[in-house]
Amino acid sequence: MQAEAFHADHNQPQTDTDESADHDACAVQAVLRTDSRAEERSMQGVAHATRCAAPDATAYTAHAGPGQVSWRLREFAMLYRRLGSTGLQLSALSFGAWVTFGKQIGRSEARNLIAAAWDNGINFFDNAEVYARGRAEQVMGDVIADLRLPRDGFCVSSKVFFGAVDSPRPTQRGLSRKHVTDACHAALKRLHVEYLDLYYCHRPDPDTPIQETVRAMDALIRQGKVLYWGTSEWSAAQLREAIAIAEREHLHAPAMEQPQYNLLHRERLEREYASLCEDGLGTTIWSPLASGLLTGKYNAGVEADSRLGQPGNQWLQDEVLGAPEARRLERARAFCAVAAELGQSPAQLAIAWCLRNPHVSSVILGASRVTQLEENLGALNTLDQVDDAGWARVESSTR
């Protein structure tokens, strides 16, 4: 089934009859293309993954378990990976609302982006209470409802810590049981869903015992408001403490971490989290392009209409380009030169590099235009277009 069958016109809602017919067609195609017809395919750097194949071709899987289904939308063969040791399969490329939703782009473009993401096989949409002070979640929720995406076909996340208001009061931020609970309820309302598939502690909270946070997350899971909880930018020691508390008290342990990961920022995932990932921790990584640095767009300076040039993003510009990381731009330029020599888009090559890590469950993409998103999705094809010698050159360019 081509993507247009679900969203033949993104500007017009479907009728119930059309939606039901499309759902039935998908179900029939899925039954016809189970792993009993699949060809096994070896793929370096990919674990627990299901590759989508064209509807008119034989489906194939990469390290997939028995009974998994392969399918494809449009020209991109989306890859699906298990979230760590859970049974949840996320699209290897996901879509996030950081910086853009509720701030840089309008509702119409947000609608086009989510529709394009869905049509190309993305099933995980990432968000947080702090993004545009809650407006990003509101816009995403409105768009998903407007597009009438089937709730059992996608996953949505939120993150808690920073708060969703300017100058938050003490109980409006952090990881206390109160704020973890209040923020969850607010996210559910803004996103127009009855539960969050993934719920992250956006940062560690030095003012709240980890035990209290673990208990709060476990309570939300038992209430059916959250399916999996995790962390973002916690230290390995803090994660191990949370896991130990959960095991000791028979609570739900964190299932995933959301760290920054790219060619210029790799130590935490590859070294600090290594043993945790081996034990089954999933990761949904952010900033695969180092806030655009690895695309080459900042090689000649920061344009006013770029992400780093947006009003209020001076802190991000300082972090990406400024001291003590001044050498980052030099390394990014070297990477872009290698990409050109390999005949690859720098953005696609950088994202594909992230996908080669078997401990990466999903790479969160950000985009302000559909053309950006579609280019980034091409990273799935880049995986097969670069040989070992080429990847070695990529590695050496950023060391």
Regions found by a protein language model. Name each.
Residues 7-26, 38:
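Intrinsically disordered, low-complexity, charge-rich segments with an acidic bias
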Residues 60, 65, 69-154, 222:
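N-terminal binding-site loop/beta-alpha segment at the start of enzyme catalytic domains
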Residues 85-101, 157-171, 195, 200:
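N-terminal small/glycine-rich loop or linker at the start of catalytic domains
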Residues 95, 127, 158, 198-201, ...:
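Conserved beta-strand positions
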Residues 97-108, 166-179, 202-203, 207-208:
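Active-site mouth loops of central-metabolism enzymes
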Residues 105-117, 175-191, 239-244:
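Short, acidic/polar
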Residues 188-208:
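Active-site groove signature of glycoside hydrolases
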Residues 208-398:
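Beta/alpha (TIM)-barrel catalytic core signal, keyed to glycine-rich beta->alpha loops juxtaposed to Asp/Glu
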